[in-house]
Amino acid sequence: MNQKFKVVLLSSMVLAACSVNAQNLVYTANSSSNAPISVAVDISQGNKYGIDLSNGATVTLDGPSISISLTGASNTGWIEGVESRGASSLLNLGGAQTKNINVSVNVDSSKPAVGLFAFKKGKITLNGENLNINVHSTEGQASGIYVQNNTTSETEGDKKASVIIDAKNTVINATSDNAKSSGIVAISQGVLRANGNIEINADKVIVARGDSTVRINESGTNTVVLNGDIDFNYSGGSSGTKIDADVLVNLTGASSQWTGNVRRSHDSEPAADKAQVTGFKLKVADNAQWNPTIITSSSIYKYVIN
């Protein structure tokens, strides 16, 4: 049975194993489904998200395939394939039987376009064989994954926004015709962990600041391909947090490589105590390659290369 509709889920429920075709999915209470999921959104009709989760709900979608597609034109509000926000909000995408998770955002807009967004303690986990995130915008910034907690002193890990990738293979492509693109953005104590094989293609493969945490191939057992810069960012016009973040990238094995640079960016010059990077760790081992295109002065980057 195929159904095509806007789904608003306000109470705890379980969806049977039938294909769900929807204009968008809104969750404010616990829910689960092992059905194939297909969400197609035309943003010119008003919706700006594919899956929206809030209110502390726990939602598990672990069917054989999950497809989320946003297209069209609009210049109002952020455009997001998936968002999980608020304390205890948890979206589990994919599981043991999931072959493909495809998130595509291809829009004509001047507003930010994002594939997956974990915001203010919201959490997203991703499991399965293949995770593909493709984000393109004509005029706005494009980001594959965005994780932002909006805190500076949170000490409890379960109170931080997070995206945990346990898919076997992940590919993130982010492009914009007239703005910057980022594969992963982790700011204000947001947490991102990518535990399988991963490839990222963007102007900036990682943007980090404000004591965020990024872990790429922490186990050292997977293949990592990065094409783009790693950027420690200062935004005086918004958060004003320091540019430092805890970023670990393990390039291990002959198939792993990074083409790009470590850099910093800012909209205004940060104070000296906010301008140093001490938390970046890069491991290049077992015939992996780092191919920097520009060697930047190390005076602003105190990073460790093993």
What is the meaning of each model-derived region?
Residues 1-23:
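Gram-negative bacterial Sec-dependent N-terminal signal peptides
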Residues 23-203, 207-228, 234-259, 266-293, ...:
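Surface-exposed loop/turn motifs in large extracellular/passenger domains
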